[in-house]
Amino acid sequence: MMYNAPLDDMRFALNHVVDLPGVTSAIGKEDSISPDLVDAILEEAGKLATGVIATTNRDGDVSGARRNDDGTVTTPPGFADAYKAMAEGGWTAMDAEEEFGGQAMPMVVSSMVNEIWQSSNMAFALCHLLTQGQIYALQKAASPEQQAVFIPPMVEGRWTGTMNLTEPQAGTDLAAIRTKAVREDDHYRITGQKIYITYGEHDMAENIVHLVLARTPDAPAGVKGISVFIVPKFLVNEDGSLGERNDVHCVSLEKKLGIKGSPTAVLAYGESGGAIGYLVGEENKGLEIMFGMMNHARFAVGLQGLAVSERAYQQALYYAHDRKQGTPLGREDGDTIIHHPDVLRLLATMKSEITAMRALAALGGGALDLAHADPDQEDRAALLIPIIKGWLTERSLGLTSQAVQVHGGMGFIEDTGIAQHYRDARILPIYEGTTAIQANDLVFRKTIRDKGASMTALLDEIAGEASALTGHDDAVVARAAAAMTDAVG
């Protein structure tokens, strides 16, 4: 069963959940970004997703990425061509600033497009997700010279980006990082090992730009001594052409439960003298810089939770309309399971929760846009990110499980394909910060820091919506209003 972008549901979120004209006006783009343009963007993204990207999803899960004897990595069939199609269509340029060749599209719009990519093939779309995050980080923290060299090729889709944090002894505890960076003239020599590096090596782009956390020799202990470095796979000549291979290599790929089409690499830095890296910002300020990229990635992972749930729902709905099981009284032929009450319950639950997930994601995208234009709005956006990442990813586990349940015994058989979505979803509450990390972030960083002002404002907004719906003529709406009122106290 092929994927079709839920364009009507996306239009509903943009028109009735988020004030799209208000957002575009706030960021000074009301004249250049019209509703008709946004509609056309979503339609064209849907065509590319259905016709090209989604066709690679099953093969990616079955064949997976493969490391070759020379250390190169071959991605599944169709992945490289699909990424080329994205680049040629200008889709890799959506988020970047115009000065770097980007389109500076509002986040509330680009997040809808990213949902489409992630639904069509989550393992494939991870490459674009991390590249977007690195572009965002470099736009904020890199020097003008670094920006000029590294951002435009990623915007064009010729290069891709990664985020290198984790080491065997340093997962959530980044204070345990041991990768070293020793200054040498205008650059640093990087030595160490990084693990769980998504698209750390692949064949979809000319170059890979790694953003690496490391320590200088005299760095303070703990997280206060972490710096961040740009380490390209191939060094870049003064004219922008690619030079010699840098001293960073893929030594193995992880064998995973899900997202098997994405190469998750173990990278070795400095086996032949040290990889050349370039300091971003100041020494010992790396974690602050990387958090900018991580927040972008956490929002994007929340979108993945929505996306995989949507894909699983579509497949479950198709199966329920197609599968005949049981014969109603008075009929000789069987009936499709869409008429079974419990199947209807499962599908209705999935649809309603996915609608809520998309609404929350749209609110988050709009909040990020407003924060980009007005620093006073940053607290609201920051508050929503751990909520989006935590709730959307946790619910994706339940919703993809329900999609398997709709299939009955066939859901447990890999040939149907529905199990892939269940397996793919399992990583989402883990990477880019576990759900427990999101909870800590929400309480200790996002709530306590302003003495609960942002959270109180959000709860008051929810209470106001509930109050406006109290006593509504529609009994379902009235019950929802009562539940909202109870939830916010």
Residues of each region from the PLM?
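Conserved catalytic-core motifs characterized by acidic clusters
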Residues: 24-27, 199, 278-293, 322-341, ...
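Internal maturation/activation junctions in enzymes
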Residues: 130-131, 142-179, 183-186, 193, ...
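Alpha-helix capping/hinge segments and adjacent helical runs
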Residues: 183, 259, 379-459
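Extended amphipathic alpha-helical segments enriched in small hydrophobics
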Residues: 298-371, 451-489
